[in-house]
C-alpha cells in the first residue's frame, strides 16, 4: 500500500518548492497558529468575496500590518486564495483555499495541530540530542518523569486535553468495526491493557451485555478509568488493576478470554513489546485471543496518513519515551510472534483512519 515511496515523480521546480516549505516550516506553523487563534482564519472562511485586510483588521481590532503579513503567508502556503478584481488598484480580497478549508473545518487536522502545538512543539527543539541519547529529553518541559505516561494525569490541562484528543480521535473511530471482530468468539472476560479512560471498555459493555472488562494500566491512570466507568453505571462490569508492564516483577493476571491493546504497543520498543507479550503468554490459555489495534504506516491508503504516522514517531522520540515509534506491519508482527504467539487474522483498513486489527494466539 505504500507504492508512493518507490517513485520520485516530482518535477525539480516542485521539489525545490517543497524544500523551501521545510526550510520555513516553523514560521508557517506559527503563522497558522496565529491565523487560527486571532480569528483571522475563521473570519475569512465566513466571507466568500469581500475579505480585505482593512476589513479584517477593523473587525478583529488588529493592525493592518499584522493581518497583512499573516494573510500573505497564508497565500504562500495555500491557506488563502485571492479573488480577481476588475480594478487593479482595488485592495486584495482574500478567500479560503482548499488547505484553509481543512485547517478550519477538518477535525483530524485540528487534532493534529493541537497535539503538535500543545504537546510536541517546545519539547522537540533539540531533536538531535534525543536521537543520540535515546531519552525523551523534551518531556522536561512538563515534568521529571521517565515517560509521558507516568505523568499523563499531571500534564497541564491544555496539553492533557490535546493528548487525549489525539489518542482517542484515531482509535475511537475504529471501534465500531473492531467490536464485531473481537466479539465473534464471545469473550466473557476481556483484559484491556493500557485502557486509559475506559472508552474501549465502555464500548464493549454497551455492545455485549455479558462481558466483563478488566483494565490494566498505570496506577496514576486507573482512577480516570474508574470515574468514567462509574459515570456510565458500569462499575460492576469494568474493574481495574494497577500494573506497570515494564516492571520486571509485574504479572498479567490469568483468566482472560481476550486481551485487547489499542494504540498501546507503539508506546514501547520492539524488545519491550516482546517482553510484554511474554507476560501475556504466561497468563494466557490456548484459546485466549490477543487483539492488537494499531495504525501501521505501511498499511495506509493515503500518503498523508503515512506521513502523519511518521511524524508521530518523532513525538515518541522526543516526548513520550525515547525508544518507540509507529511501526510497520512486519516489524510489529515479528515482535509479538517472538514472544511465542502466532498471527491468526489481520484486518487492515479498519475504520476511516486505516487501522490494522491483528489477532494472535499461542503457537
Give, region by region, the residue ranges found by the protein language model.
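Alpha-helical subdomain
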Residues: 1-82, 184, 189-363
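Conserved Class I S-adenosyl-L-methionine-dependent methyltransferase catalytic core
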Residues: 4-10, 15-48, 58-59, 65-188
Amino acid at each position: 500500500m505504500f507504492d508512493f515511496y518507490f517513485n520520485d515523480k516530482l518535477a525539480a521546480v516542485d521539489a525545490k518548492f517543497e524544500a523551501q516549505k521545510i526550510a520555513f516550516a516553523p514560521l508557517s506553523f506559527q503563522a497558522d497558529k496565529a491565523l487560527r487563534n486571532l480569528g483571522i482564519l475563521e473570519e475569512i472562511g465566513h466571507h466568500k468575496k469581500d475579505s480585505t485586510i482593512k476589513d479584517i483588521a477593523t473587525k478583529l481590532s488588529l493592525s493592518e500590518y499584522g493581518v497583512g503579513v499573516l494573510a500573505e503567508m497564508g497565500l504562500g502556503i495555500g491557506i488563502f486564495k485571492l479573488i480577481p478584481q476588475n480594478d487593479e488598484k482595488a485592495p486584495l480580497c482574500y478567500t479560503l483555499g482548499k488547505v484553509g478549508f481543512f485547517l478550519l473545518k477538518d477535525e483530524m487536522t485540528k487534532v493534529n495541530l493541537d497535539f503538535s502545538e500543545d504537546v510536541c512543539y517546545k519539547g522537540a527543539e533539540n531533536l538531535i540530542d534525543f536521537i543520540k541519547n535515546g531519552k525523551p529529553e523534551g518531556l522536561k518541559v512538563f515534568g521529571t518523569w521517565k515517560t509521558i505516561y507516568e505523568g499523563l494525569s499531571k500534564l497541564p490541562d491544555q496539553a492533557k486535553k490535546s493528548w487525549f484528543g489525539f489518542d482517542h480521535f484515531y482509535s475511537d473511530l475504529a471501534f465500531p468495526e473492531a467490536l464485531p471482530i473481537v466479539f465473534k468468539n464471545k469473550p466473557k472476560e476481556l483484559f484491556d491493557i493500557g485502557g486509559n479512560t475506559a472508552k474501549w471498555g465502555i464500548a464493549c459493555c454497551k455492545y455485549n451485555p455479558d462481558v466483563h472488562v478488566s483494565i490494566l494500566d498505570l496506577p496514576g491512570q486507573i482512577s480516570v478509568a474508574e470515574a468514567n466507568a462509574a459515570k456510565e453505571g458500569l462499575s460492576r462490569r469494568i474493574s481495574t488493576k494497577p500494573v506497570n508492564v515494564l516492571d520486571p516483577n509485574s504479572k498479567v493476571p490469568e483468566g482472560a478470554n481476550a486481551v485487547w491493546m489499542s494504540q498501546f504497543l507503539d508506546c514501547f520498543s520492539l524488545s519491550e513489546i516482546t517482553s510484554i507479550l511474554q507476560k501475556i503468554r504466561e497468563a494466557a490459555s490456548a484459546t485466549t485471543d490477543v487483539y492488537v489495534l494499531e495504525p501501521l504506516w505501511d498499511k495506509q491508503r493515503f500518503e498523508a496518513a503515512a506521513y502523519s504516522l511518521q511524524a508521530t514517531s518523532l513525538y515518541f522520540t522526543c516526548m513520550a519515551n525515547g525508544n518507540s515509534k509507529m511501526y510497520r506491519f512486519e516489524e510489529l508482527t515479528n515482535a509479538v510472534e517472538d514472544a511465542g504467539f502466532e498471527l491468526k487474522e489481520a484486518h487492515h483498513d479498519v475504520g476511516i483512519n486505516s487501522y490494522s486489527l491483528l489477532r494472535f494466539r499461542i503457537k
